[in-house]
């Protein structure tokens, strides 16, 4: 079945409401394998931050999960696809940046918290830049989530679990960078 971006996003949000666990990578893995999530695409602008919000809530973080996910979907749907290559900022990072802003309730007129999430986004973008391209929405999500887990622990005192990340999406990614990817699974061979 072919889904619109709105339908993909609605299914992601519905899945997050139902899923347990405090590991954003495991939440991502459970949802990213569904038919409504493509290998690459702007649904990641909703999915990546939604996994962080879900894990944060499940770990005891103080948010109204339904309202937070709806707000994230609104923000994520406003981000166009291919911003990584066209604007120089990755949608995985902006999605999680939006999730952090939702947790804090910050906006463009916030004073003391205004720049705090930029510390996260700049660190995550620096890590992505070091890996290089071409883009991979899965690899970028993994890097952005890893960076977010330590940020969330330091900023909010909420511990999210994070198991070692191993990518199983390589066979479906025609542009996989293989062993240059920090998450490449050896059984998928050299590229």
Report each predicted region and the residues it spans.
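Cys/His-rich short segments
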Residues: 1-6, 170-171, 178-191
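Non-catalytic, interaction-prone regions of core transcription and DNA-replication machinery
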Residues: 2-28, 78, 82
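Polybasic, low-complexity association/targeting segments
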Residues: 15-49
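A short glycine/serine-rich beta->alpha loop
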Residues: 30-42, 78-88, 128-132
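Short, contiguous, pocket-lining structural segments
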Residues: 40-44, 48, 88, 136, ...
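Conserved mixed alpha/beta catalytic, RNA-binding, or beta-rich assembly cores of soluble enzyme
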Residues: 46-59, 66-114, 118
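A structural-propensity feature for long, helix-poor, extended segments
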Residues: 103-153
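C-terminal domain-closing interface element
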Residues: 139-168, 181
């Amino acid at each position: 079945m072919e889904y619109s971006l709105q339908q993909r996003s609605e299914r992601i949000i519905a899945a997050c409401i139902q899923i347990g666990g405090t590991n954003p990578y495991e939440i991502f893995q459970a949802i990213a394998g569904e038919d409504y999530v493509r290998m690459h695409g702007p649904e990641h602008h909703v999915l990546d931050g939604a996994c962080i919000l879900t894990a944060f809530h499940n770990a005891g973080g103080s948010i109204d999960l339904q309202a937070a996910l709806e707000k994230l979907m609104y923000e994520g749907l406003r981000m166009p696809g291919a911003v990584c290559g066209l604007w120089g900022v990755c949608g995985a990072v902006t999605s999680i940046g939006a999730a952090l802003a939702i947790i804090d309730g910050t906006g463009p007129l916030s004073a003391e918290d205004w720049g705090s999430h930029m510390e996260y986004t700049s660190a995550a973008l620096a890590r992505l830049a070091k890996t290089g391209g071409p883009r991979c929405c899965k690899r970028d999500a993994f890097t952005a989530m890893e960076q977010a887990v330590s940020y969330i622990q330091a900023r909010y005192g909420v511990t999210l679990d994070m198991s070692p990340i191993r990518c199983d999406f390589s066979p479906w990614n025609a542009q996989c960078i293989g062993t240059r990817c920090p998450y490449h699974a050896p059984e998928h061979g050299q590229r």
